């Protein structure tokens, strides 16, 4: 297997090429990319957890260090000023020496405000990309060159196409997340609370709560009907019925985003519905290929949802086509089939149709879909269908012409289980689709 160092060398070459093209197009000399800064809680001296600028960690796997700066021009070796203060109050990361440091010039930056004296004197034609525009102004960057939309759109568009280095990192993140999911299922089977299941997950993945790429969704029973449930009850419920876990991991700044759902019992209607959603999810992935719109796969899954609603007699006396046409599947799967994945969990450029940033919105019928792209080789996406029993979405259907088609008794029986979601992370290749999650044998 090719080493991470050689993959990274090629990755940097790709980023340099993209940078040259962007600088030429937008008539800039270089980009100054800021890792970010710590921000204190209001009226306090305690900072919020640091989250690095995604455009910064695209270049270097430095995710925990604020006040760092990258200068890139697409030609010369990228220059990294790495924040290295003399500080006995806080942990100070040492100057990095790793697989990637041969391809980047790494320079110690002892003072956060010392970058100004180290940058080129002529800065009028340098673009700043980062979260603190006032810092850029202090450095003499032109206001029009601070987070220039055209440059960011261009870089975002091409971030959709992962390099081999990025895919290698994402496969490592998958391994960590899969370990966590196995530990969490074991904790669920042993009767633990949501809080303790989360601890088991974090321990297995080697993450802190602030390290995971998004807040873990650890939902027992009816909590699985809350799409982004993050409360974490300390007390286990008296009766364990179901468990939905949506939790990821991060490796060198790249995310995994997996979801699994388990039934406490294997012989009830809910357990069969979990199995059927899983089977339909795999069947959809088996049809995926480059050159097809992601929207088409979302619509196709609503047809599969209709099939399951009919099979389980949740909707009766109506054809599957009529269910989809009249959006009776909508309240059961109110979110999109998935989203782009990469340096960010909901990765950028999901609606971008070209490198000029042309936007194609989600269909009006499915406004929460996060991607309208034609699938192309190098893209990484989640496929995460679900079926839920959410009263606020079902309530409008209790009246009107379609109410009689809903098996309300069956729905009431399933509501205590909350819902179901199954999520894998897939890579689009020229002639196949790689399922990174199932390749690790996560059922």
UniProtKB/Swiss-Prot annotation:
Binds 2 manganese ions per subunit. One of its GO terms (biological process) is proteolysis. Pfam families: PepQ_N, Peptidase_M24. One of its GO terms (molecular function) is proline dipeptidase activity. Its cofactor is Mn(2+). Mn(2+) 1 binds at residues 257, 339, 384, 423. One of its GO terms (cellular component) is cytosol. It is an enzyme of class 3 (hydrolase). Its EC number is 3.4.13.9. PANTHER family: XAA-PRO AMINOPEPTIDASE 3 (PTHR43226), XAA-PRO DIPEPTIDASE (PTHR43226:SF8). This is Xaa-Pro dipeptidase. It comes from Shigella dysenteriae serotype 1 (strain Sd197). The gene is pepQ.
């Amino acid at each position: 297997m090719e080493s991470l160092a050689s993959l990274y060398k090629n990755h940097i070459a790709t980023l340099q090429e993209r940078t040259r093209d962007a600088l030429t197009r937008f008539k800039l000399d270089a980009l100054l990319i800021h890792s970010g800064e710590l921000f204190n809680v209001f009226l306090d001296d305690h900072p919020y957890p640091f989250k690095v600028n995604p455009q910064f960690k695209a270049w270097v796997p430095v995710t925990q260090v604020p006040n760092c700066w990258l200068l890139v021009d697409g030609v010369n070796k990228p220059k990294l000023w790495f924040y290295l203060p003399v500080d006995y109050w806080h942990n100070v990361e040492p100057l990095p020496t790793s697989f990637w440091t041969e391809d980047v010039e790494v320079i110690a930056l002892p003072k956060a405000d010392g970058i100004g004296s180290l940058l080129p004197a002529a800065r009028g034609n340098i673009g700043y990309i980062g979260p603190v525009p006032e810092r850029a102004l202090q450095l003499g960057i032109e206001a029009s060159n601070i987070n220039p939309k055209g440059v960011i759109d261009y870089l975002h568009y091409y971030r959709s196409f992962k390099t081999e280095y990025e895919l290698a990192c994402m496969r490592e993140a998958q391994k960590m997340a899969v370990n966590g999911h196995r530990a969490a299922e074991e904790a669920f089977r042993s009767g633990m609370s949501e809080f303790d299941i989360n601890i088991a997950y974090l321990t297995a993945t080697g993450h802190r709560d602030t390290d995971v790429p998004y807040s873990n969704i650890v939902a027992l029973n009816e909590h699985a009907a809350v799409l982004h449930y993050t409360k974490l009850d300390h007390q286990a419920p008296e009766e364990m019925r179901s468990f939905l876990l949506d939790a990821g991991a991060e490796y060198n700044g790249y995310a995994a985003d997996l979801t699994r759902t388990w039934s406490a019992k294997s012989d009830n209607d809910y357990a069969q519905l979990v199995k059927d959603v899983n089977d339909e999810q795999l069947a959809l992935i088996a049809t995926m290929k480059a050159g097809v719109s992601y929207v088409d796969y979302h619509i196709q899954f609503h047809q599969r949802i209709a099939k399951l609603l009919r099979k389980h007699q949740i909707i009766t006396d109506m054809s599957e086509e009529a269910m989809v046409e009249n959006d009776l599947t909508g309240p059961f799967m109110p979110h999109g089939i998935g989203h782009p994945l990469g340096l960010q969990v909901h990765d950028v450029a999901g609606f971008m149709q070209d490198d000029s940033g042309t936007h194609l919105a989600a269909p009006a019928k499915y406004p929460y879909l996060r991607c309208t792209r034609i699938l192309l080789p190098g893209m990484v996406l989640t496929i995460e269908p679900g079926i839920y029993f959410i009263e606020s979405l079902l309530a409008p259907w209790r009246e009107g012409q379609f109410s009689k088609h809903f098996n309300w008794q069956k729905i009431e029986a399933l509501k205590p289980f909350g819902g179901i979601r199954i999520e894998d992370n897939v890579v689009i290749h020229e002639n196949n689709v790689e399922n990174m999650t199932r390749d690790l044998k996560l059922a």
